């Protein structure tokens, strides 16, 4: 998976956790870039109206110092309904969060405990509604060190 040399450390780490290999590139970027050859777009430092890249899995990142100051967490934007259902299971230990714990069957798949707490989600919705139509990118290749020489 192609990853810019200058990006946040968790990007190549996440690629490695999926079982893929990282190929670092000299891409100069601002706000967002694609993890080629996949339709995954890292938009961790961009949040502006109309930014969604059609037919992609566009990753947003939240932090108290970012454009949308929602504690810490993220979101994946996509128009792929099957992927949305998979993400919903994956974020909640492979379980359907609508089923009460005492009625819950075994997990449908191996998942993670990575859902956004309801209080943060509510704050995020509030901030989404208040967000400006256009925001300057809060990061790009100029903001990060070259991490291609790190041992992974």
Label each region the model flagged.
Residues 47-49, 57-152:
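Active-site region of PLP-dependent enzymes
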Residues 53:
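Nucleotide-sugar donor-binding and catalytic loop/hinge architecture
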